[in-house]
């Protein structure tokens, strides 16, 4: 059960005094009220906000970029379900204070991307879908069965651990609920087109035995978990009438920014190689443009002894689309 955030009291005539006017962040009130409630620690949507140093940095960095900060706080203060959203995305108010999505995007671009992302999700999801997305570990996109009856799920969710790389994540779980692959993105308007902008791609966490990946790959007829989340991302993009899919490269990942130079070693995936393996092409901005649909080998081109396995792979991939066909309004 999601806990609601504390009620906040703000005096609009004298900000140093508390009055009888109370509200929760989900109500549409002033951006200044939301800002002060966060800076003062009256609203603490996550563990980060319990640290005075975190709140002080939020205050100082907001003052350094006053115009964007006011615009962002004003945007957030009018969002429905903000109190619930902040329990899932507690660092949402500080998105503009650190590198996000891609190393070469401006803060203004990031603000517009965040605004677009959540507006599009609210527009395209039914009330039930949006509620499940906000209030549960994951909105199920598809359920898949392995060669020996193993159960896997593809889910749309939000992950604090990936929040620098995007605000939504599609993950692939095994029957024990262990995520084996994650692809993180933000929906935005980029270069005049509705875009799925992918900022992160990860396999299983380091503590998960590699045998789990091997078992899942074998059960899925040789399909790697990352390939399955990529397929789901393409189908999700189609459902939302996305016009292009852009992905960060090894060179434009957020860990290439000056702030995160000490974390470059945390990029374990070879983004460029993976995007190229699914037909991606590097553009002038050093991002990869990915196909709306991943090309498949023709059965006739495959060695006869492998054709049966490829047919089973394609059957598994084809099982995703019908399950998503009735979801979202596009």
Swiss-Prot record:
Q: Which family does it belong to?
A: To H.influenzae HI_0461.
This chain belongs to which protein, by name?
A: Uncharacterized protein YbjX
Task: Supply the gene name.
Answer: ybjX
- Gene Ontology biological process terms, A to Z: DNA damage response
Entry-linked PANTHER family: HOMOLOG OF VIRK
Organism superkingdom: Bacteria
A Pfam family annotated for this UniProt entry:
DUF535
């Amino acid at each position: 059960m999601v806990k609601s955030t504390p009620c906040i009291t703000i005096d609009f005539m004298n900000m140093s005094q508390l009055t009888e006017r109370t509200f929760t962040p989900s109500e549409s009130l002033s951006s200044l009220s939301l800002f002060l409630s966060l800076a003062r620690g009256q609203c603490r949507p996550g563990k980060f906000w319990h640290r005075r140093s975190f709140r002080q940095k939020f205050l100082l960095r907001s003052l350094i970029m006053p115009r964007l900060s006011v615009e962002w706080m004003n945007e957030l203060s009018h969002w429905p379900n903000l109190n619930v959203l902040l329990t899932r995305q507690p660092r949402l108010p500080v998105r503009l204070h650190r590198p996000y999505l891609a190393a070469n995007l401006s803060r203004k671009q990031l603000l517009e991307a965040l605004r677009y992302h959540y507006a599009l999700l609210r527009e395209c999801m039914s009330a039930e879908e949006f509620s499940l997305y906000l209030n549960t570990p994951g909105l199920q996109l598809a359920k898949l069965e392995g060669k020996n009856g193993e159960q896997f799920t593809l889910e749309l969710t939000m992950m604090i651990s990936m929040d620098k790389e995007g605000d939504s994540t599609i993950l692939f779980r095994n029957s024990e609920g262990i995520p084996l692959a994650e692809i993180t993105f933000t929906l935005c308007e980029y270069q005049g087109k509705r875009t799925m902008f992918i900022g992160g791609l990860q396999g299983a966490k380091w503590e998960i035995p590699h045998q789990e990946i091997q078992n899942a790959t074998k059960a899925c007829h040789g399909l790697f978990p990352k390939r399955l989340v990529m397929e789901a991302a393409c189908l999700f993009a189609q459902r939302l009438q996305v016009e292009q899919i852009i992905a960060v490269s090894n060179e434009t990942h957020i860990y290439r920014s000056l702030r995160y130079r000490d974390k470059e070693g945390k990029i374990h995936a070879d983004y460029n190689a993976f995007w190229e393996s699914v037909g991606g092409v590097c553009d002038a901005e050093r991002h990869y443009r990915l196909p709306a649909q991943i090309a498949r080998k023709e059965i006739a081109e495959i060695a006869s002894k492998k054709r049966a396995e490829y047919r089973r792979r394609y059957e598994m991939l084809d099982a995703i689309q019908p399950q998503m066909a009735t979801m979202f309004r596009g």
